Each structure stands twice: as C-alpha cells, then as structure tokens.
C-alpha cells in the first residue's frame, strides 16, 4: 500500500512534525579502532582554550600543569577558560541570598549521606579504569581489586564497609612510599593429553606481585582512562569520554550528592529530575516570564548552546564553589568535598590503545602503544596526527597526558549546573538594576535563556550582559549555534516547547522492538514500551495499535514462533505445529509457543501469562509454570524486573516491566571461552562478589532497611539480623522450636569460625 507522505501531515500542526527531522531511525554510528586521536584532540583543545594561563610543575609527579584561573579577560568572542574566582564566589553569594539557607540545608543532607553510604555504592556503573591492571574492568571487579591491594598494603579502614572509610584508605595510600600490587598474567605450555595422547596447549593463570613507587602510583590514581563515545547521532566526528578510577570515584560521588541536593531546590535546574516532572518544572519558569510580560514588555527566548562546556570549566573553580558552599561546616566535611576538585586539577588522561599501523605491501600490522608516542619518529604519521603528537608531547608521562584544566565529560554534571543557574539567578531586576531582566533553565551544558525588556534594544542589552557575565565564570555561549525567538517557541534538552511541550516521539523510536533478553522478558518489555509511550509521548491509539502489530510480527520473526497454523517454514515450525495440533484451547498458547496474539491497546498492562491463563490447557499450564522443569535455569522470581531501554538521547534508561517467571524466562549461559583466558580469575572474583551481595540483599530486603550504619561487618550484620528474625518468627509461631534452635546454632558456628580466622 503506497502512502503519500505529505498526507500524513495535513492534520498535524507544524511543530509536531519536528519528530520527522531527527536522525533517530536505523542504527547509530559506532566507533572502531582506537580513541587515542580523539583524546589528544580533547587535551590539545583544552590547553588551547586556557593557553594564556600560568604553567607550573606538579612536585609529586613532575607533570606540567596549566592554570588559567584569574587569567586575562577575553577581548574577542573565542571560547576561553579564564574564570575569575571573585566572580564565581559572588555569583554563589547572590544565589544564596535569593535562596536563604539553601547551601546550609544541602550540606546537612549530604553529611548524613556521607556517614551512611556503603562502599558497595561504587560497584554501580559500567566500565571503570582499574589502576591495578591498567585497563578497564567492570566496576565491581575494579573495586574488589583496589580493596585487595589496599589490604595487602596494610590499609584496613575499608573493612567496615563505609565509603568514607574507604576514602580514608585512598588518602593514606597516596602518602605511601611504594605500593605492592598483584597483576594477572597468562602462561602457556605444551602438554600431552592422557586420553588422546596428542599435544595440547594448556593455559594457566598466574598472579605476580609488582612494586609501584609513589610517583607511579600517584599517576595511576589520578588517571582517567579514555574511550570513544559510541552511538552518538547527528555528529560527523566522534569524541572521547573518560572513565575515572576507584580513587576518584568516591570523592566525586559525594560532591555530586551535595550538588544534586542544591539542584533539587533550584527552580531553574533541569537536573536531577527527568521526563514529565522536568517538563512541569520548565513550564513553570516560562509561565512566570510570560505572565509578567503581557502588556508592556517584550519577551524573547534563546535556545542556547555553549561551546565546549567541559573543556572550559575548571576544577579549581569548582574548589572555590565548594569552599563557599561549605563555609561554617565541620572541617572534615569540607576536606572530604575538596578532594575531588583537587584530584581533577592534577588529573592525567590516559591516551588509550595507541595507533595501529599496517603495511599494505608486506601485509604486516603493528600496534604503537600510547607509551611510545613520546619518543617515536613522527615520519610514520600523517600531517594531522603529527601536529597532534607534537603539541601533546610536552605533557606526556608514561603514556598519559597531564590535563589540569577542563573537566572530562559527565563528571560534575550537577555542580556545573549549579554554576550555570547562579548566572541565570543574576537576571532578577534587583541585580540587573535596569529595565531588562532574565531567567532561564540549565541542565548541565544545555540552557534556555528568557529575556524580558520594554523594547528590542533592552532585549539586546540583556543578552549581551548575560553573555559577558557567563564569560567571567568560564561559560562560553556560542553566538553561532544559539538562536533567539519570541518566547513560546524554544528547545531545551531535546524537549521542544511551543505554547507547551510538544511530544518528540522520534526520540523513543530506538526503544521499540525486540530487546533480545528472552522470550518472556521481550514480550513484556515490548508492550510496556508501547504503553509508556501512550501515557507520556502522545502515541495515539491508531498508531499504538499499529506499533503493537509490528512488534508482534518482529517478535515472531526473532524467535521463529509464527502461529501454529501458518505456512511459514522455520527451524521451529515442526515442533510448534505439533504443539498447535495437540492443544485443545489454542488461544491459551503464548505467542512464543506459536499461539495467537491477544494483546490490544486496552490490555497492555497485563503480562501475557496472566492474560491467557484461564484459556490454557491444564497440562500446558503445568509445563509452562513449573519451577522443576529441567530445561530451565531459573532466575529467582521477582514480580517487577528492570530492563535497560535505549532512548535516542541521553543514557540508557531503566524501565520497569512486570515479570512472570515461566519456562520462557531462561538465562543464556556464559560463553565458555572466557574460562580459558586471563580473565578467569577476575570472573571468579566477580561471581564471588555477586553471591555475597545477593546474600546480603536476602537478609536486608531493600524495602525494609536503611543500610546498616556503624562498624559491623556484612557477616555480623547478617548474623544479628538472622537472630532477630528467627526470634520474631519463633515467638509468633511461624517456626518450630527445633528450627529456631538450629538457626541459633548455625549463627554461633559462623561467629566461631570468624573468631578462629
């Protein structure tokens, strides 16, 4: 059926058609090869923006460092990072004046968090730079390795399990003259197989000890590993992102906790809320500006874009902000929060894998690791790479580049938002002292500025003043990429506002489709995505019905589970036809067993098993929901699971979906090839860690506990919890005396074993 696309838009107001212009269908671009070039770009650009600053040398690591703070005031419109300390402090003071008590209260909230956060908070997150192995690892493994090394070097504060104690260890580790670390390596040897008498290669994993002196350790502790950001749409060039190591992460977490607490209290902040809550917050600011400008004033809005936000921010400025925000707070608290910006002022950027060379004539490939870039002859490189390397050479130490100015992407989103809002806050009439005034919205580096004035000259003057005020704190509004409109039409964080927010449905397109977890989860996630978009994103009933039909079709092709009475032949069709024929109530078969689809837009909230339960043959029910079915390795049954869905913008979102455990909720087994590699020891550590955490969660279901505070270990906490629960269950008659006695005995045994250890 041919559709003339223009017909689709006859009834649609033009602003709703914004969706069709977004680059969100199809696969996003991924990066291949090394990120070294992108990282060098970042380092060189950052230094260029701050080039008129003062050069110093770090006494501990010998790294050359550039400090642009209080540098020359800009004379042109080029981006620059010369923030003025007194201007930043004054902006903070005015922010506090217009929000009395905001800093004080946020500090109190943060102090409570600091005292209660457990070190396992650092296991959240994906890849983390593991300084012991000098490469990226899953967060939990990197943390376990760090704690293991600390312990073997006599640092034991972290055993209490509080994050703050782990951070004490980090501080102490930096004073040590040397650290002993364990690295994994692989040995291969040829042995004869007893059974087949053939020679086979046997791999063994070894751990070897290695001593690292203070300077090398500091460099590793201050290193951010870099990667290329994947799946970025609408860009021609890729860019580098950073992943910090465990020494930095905890400190950053506390700073961001404080900043988040402040952002929650600021009406102009687009963080940390999201979705509909964010839209409501933003609509309020717009409403305020429009109501005040009805008769006499003009109101204009800038859809703003900042040039290289991260590369012009400066950790020293963040230190000044924190010093101001935490004034009058206890000394220990101020110290803990100052460490993150200080570490960032001394950070090192790891250049990644290096370059790959291949000779077409000799069919040779060779890797030039980043460590060699300092000394290699540049004649092998092309013009642009040669320039990059020449520029970065003075900054190189052991394959990392000293990068004092600038903040790598995504590290201090909340705190930089506070800085942005403090400039928006200066737009009140009592501060501008003229006829123009401004307000706006800020979310990390994205902003919208609303300026009101009696006439066009006033608007122009207001924008100019805002622009210049931003320059004073190292924020560079891009005159090329920002545009101005009558208030009522603007874009902010990919929300399009036209007398109210317009649903930008194309953003959600990537999350439609089959996720590929397993048959049960995929069905549930698929219909939940459609349901959520009907609620939040103006997905109309007709389109939703069509999306549902397309999803079912996609699902059937993915799992080769076409209806039992279909003509389509697949590997599964023989089995599914047989099942179809011997089933009395065919409507009861799940779609993944070749059954019909009973979903429509009214019942998307019901899990498929529940929807069809009454229609199922009894023996089918028995097979489907039988935990003893030998073909299924079962997850524990939780009524609500979390799926990771990929919206087009921003990070992957976690989305809840109802999960009914059936024989279709299988978990694919881990690929065995990993078991023969040097990763094996790491894998075992990780599984061990996982088991401990799961066990702990069993004792303290997250709904019922605030993380235990104090110095008891996980084991002690679990034992005492078991005793309490057992006593309650025994006294209420839920368990017998014998069972109670047995539990008590087990608890004592565990304590005894711990004492012997």
Swiss-Prot record:
Q: Which reaction does it catalyse?
A: RNA(n) + a ribonucleoside 5'-triphosphate = RNA(n+1) + diphosphate
| EC number(s) given by UniProt | 2.7.7.48
Per the Swiss-Prot or TrEMBL annotation, the motif Nuclear localization signal is positioned at 187-195, 203-216
- Region of interest called Disordered, as start-end residue ranges on this chain: 52-82
Q: Which PROSITE patterns match?
A: RDRP_SSRNA_NEG_SEG
Give its localization. Answer: Host nucleus; Host cytoplasm
- Which GO MF terms are attached to this record? nucleotide binding; RNA binding; RNA-directed RNA polymerase activity
| Record flagged with keyword Cell cycle | no
Q: Where is this region: Promoter-binding site?
A: 249-256
The main place the protein resides is: host cell
Q: Name one GO cellular component term.
A: host cell nucleus
Q: How is it modified after translation?
A: Phosphorylated by host PRKCA.
Residue ranges annotated for the RdRp catalytic domain, each copy included: 286-483
Keyword Phosphoprotein on entry: yes
Keyword annotations from UniProtKB, A to Z: Eukaryotic host gene expression shutoff by virus, Eukaryotic host transcription shutoff by virus, Host cytoplasm, Host gene expression shutoff by virus, Host nucleus, Host-virus interaction, Inhibition of host RNA polymerase II by virus, Nucleotide-binding, Nucleotidyltransferase, Phosphoprotein, RNA-directed RNA polymerase, Transferase, Viral RNA replication, Viral transcription
GO BP annotation list:
DNA-templated transcription; symbiont-mediated suppression of host gene expression; symbiont-mediated suppression of host mRNA transcription via inhibition of RNA polymerase II activity; viral RNA genome replication; viral transcription
Residue spans with biased composition (Polar residues)?
55-64
The entry describes its oligomerization and partners as: Influenza RNA polymerase is composed of three subunits: PB1, PB2 and PA. Interacts (via N-terminus) with PA (via C-terminus). Interacts (via C-terminus) with PB2 (via N-terminus); this interaction is essential for transcription initiation.
Task: Name the protein family.
Answer: Belongs to the influenza viruses polymerase PB1 family.
Q: What does this protein do?
A: RNA-dependent RNA polymerase which is responsible for replication and transcription of virus RNA segments. The transcription of viral mRNAs occurs by a unique mechanism called cap-snatching. 5' methylated caps of cellular mRNAs are cleaved after 10-13 nucleotides by PA. In turn, these short capped RNAs are used as primers by PB1 for transcription of viral mRNAs. During virus replication, PB1 initiates RNA synthesis and copy vRNA into complementary RNA (cRNA) which in turn serves as a template for the production of more vRNAs.
| Full protein name | RNA-directed RNA polymerase catalytic subunit
Species of the source: Influenza A virus (strain A/England/878/1969 H3N2)
Gene name, Swiss-Prot/TrEMBL: PB1
